[in-house]
Amino acid sequence: MLTCNKAGSRMVVDAANSNGPFQPVVLLHIRDVPPADQEKLFIQKLRQCCVLFDFVSDPLSDLKWKEVKRAALSEMVEYITHNRNVITEPIYPEVVHMFAVNMFRTLPPSSNPTGAEFDPEEDEPTLEAAWPHLQLVYEFFLRFLESPDFQPNIAKKYIDQKFVLQLLELFDSEDPRERDFLKTTLHRIYGKFLGLRAYIRKQINNIFYRFIYETEHHNGIAELLEILGSIINGFALPLKEEHKIFLLKVLLPLHKVKSLSVYHPQLAYCVVQFLEKDSTLTEPVVMALLKYWPKTHSPKEVMFLNELEEILDVIEPSEFVKIMEPLFRQLAKCVSSPHFQVAERALYYWNNEYIMSLISDNAAKILPIMFPSLYRNSKTHWNKTIHGLIYNALKLFMEMNQKLFDDCTQQFKAEKLKEKLKMKEREEAWVKIENLAKANPQYTVYSQASTMSIPVAMETDGPLFEDVQMLRKTVKDEAHQAQKDPKKDRPLARRKSELPQDPHTKKALEAHCRADELASQDGR
């Protein structure tokens, strides 16, 4: 690369096809020359478009020549789109070289080097300053790849592994417009160059590995996953071992990264595509999701619940039996979550007909797991909407198998009584310990230094248990009431929070006088 400052110009010129820095010239339109000269003029225009301009430090420099290049690119896009037999063998190296000169560059430093989660609604992406030219170069190259005249056997000499590697590096661009073009370009190359397919998959794997285990920052993960979704869809059956390893060792660990929300829809699609291809992968996939389940990130939990429902929508009944117990133990925890969106999303599973049919076939295993969590939270959860959803789930369980529901009720009641007896025994043990302590001559000395209190029996696990018949009636009534949705007719009103008042603070505020009030009192 050489920088040309001649005549005040700030162009950066590619020297590979020229004898040094030069000013661009306005060439004739390709349509205005005889057919015999069109190929030569086409090559001249491609070389002319290898001149790079400064759009960053001085956007107003070389405006005339920037427009000349833009017009040349637009003309070439039109030319190869509407004409046949114009992509001759000498054109291939010129097109690939022009694309490489314009596109393969060092990306600017990230505007978000800490790797915090990008929020599309709040954060503005950093846009590429030279986009007026880059967009047309991408459009031209795509039309070149998609042309009926394009011959991969000729192009493979120029579009090779080095070219693909440089193309993949551009996926870290912060400009979403560029990543969108890159996604389409790479997909076309993958489709046309069979010899590059394994290499492309391998290099995408490497990008994912670096992202998961080293940087946790890359702008193009969603776009790469979107390409992979299409690739996975085309995998032949039975799946190769390398594809299964890719799912288990590359795709599933992507769930660990904190910026999951940026690419989760594309990731979930890839996972579900694999399960539709091979249902035997269901157990390792679900167990991996349960292993990576978020502990303190509620929005991420909602994403996991969304993905699990997508998996359950395509699961085979024989595979469901293998994962139902650990899965519903996790769902029971989600129903108990104080974050209402997590509890709500988990309870929406009971609105899915296919999932309900799977639950119905295996109710004897699932209901005993879910019942304690559903019952406890039917009264103690702070969000009233959750109460209605829980009663709906209990009602469905009750209609599914009345005897099993009653058995679970009695079993839960017995366990509650056991817990109360155990608590009572603990209280009595503490009373004995305290009485023994009182018998010690030095008790009065130590009792003044520390205050001891007898443990109070606390109901920490839900309300006192109703009678079975009463529970049935309560569940039916509450589920019916929840379906009515009384909030529907109420006008929307924002509820104001009421902060608990400390009496000492309140008294101090009432007694407080501002400085000007004190001054006026002194003046009197």
Curated annotation (Swiss-Prot):
Location of this chain's protein in the cell: Nucleus; Chromosome, Centromere
A UniProt-annotated Pfam family: B56
Conditions for induction: Up-regulated upon DNA damage.
Function: The B regulatory subunit might modulate substrate selectivity and catalytic activity, and might also direct the localization of the catalytic enzyme to a particular subcellular compartment. The PP2A-PPP2R5C holoenzyme may specifically dephosphorylate and activate TP53 and play a role in DNA damage-induced inhibition of cell proliferation. PP2A-PPP2R5C may also regulate the ERK signaling pathway through ERK dephosphorylation.
Family: Belongs to the phosphatase 2A regulatory subunit B56 family.
Top-level taxon: Eukaryota
Tissue expr: Highest levels in heart, skeletal muscle and brain. Lower levels in pancreas, kidney, lung and placenta. Very low levels in liver.
Residue list for modification N-acetylmethionine: 1
Assigned keywords, A-Z: Acetylation, Centromere, Chromosome, Nucleus, Phosphoprotein
GO cellular component: chromosome, centromeric region; cytosol; Golgi apparatus; nucleoplasm; nucleus; protein phosphatase type 2A complex
Region (Disordered): 476-509
Gene Ontology biological process terms in this record: DNA damage response, signal transduction by p53 class mediator; intrinsic apoptotic signaling pathway in response to DNA damage by p53 class mediator; meiotic sister chromatid cohesion; negative regulation of cell population proliferation; proteasome-mediated ubiquitin-dependent protein catabolic process; signal transduction
Name listed for the protein in its UniProt record: Serine/threonine-protein phosphatase 2A 56 kDa regulatory subunit gamma isoform
SUBUNIT field: PP2A consists of a common heterodimeric core enzyme, composed of PPP2CA a 36 kDa catalytic subunit (subunit C) and PPP2R1A a 65 kDa constant regulatory subunit (PR65 or subunit A), that associates with a variety of regulatory subunits. Proteins that associate with the core dimer include three families of regulatory subunits B (the R2/B/PR55/B55, R3/B''/PR72/PR130/PR59 and R5/B'/B56 families), the 48 kDa variable regulatory subunit, viral proteins, and cell signaling molecules. Interacts with PPP2CA and PPP2R1A; the interaction is direct. Interacts with SGO1; the interaction is direct.
Sequence motif Nuclear localization signal, location on chain: 416-422
Gene from which this protein is expressed: PPP2R5C
Post-translational modification: Isoform Gamma-3 is phosphorylated on serine residues. Isoform Gamma-1 phosphorylation by ERK2 is IER3-dependent and inhibits ERK dephosphorylation by PP2A-PPP2R5C.
Signal peptide limits: none
GO molecular function, one term: protein phosphatase activator activity
Organism: Homo sapiens (Human)
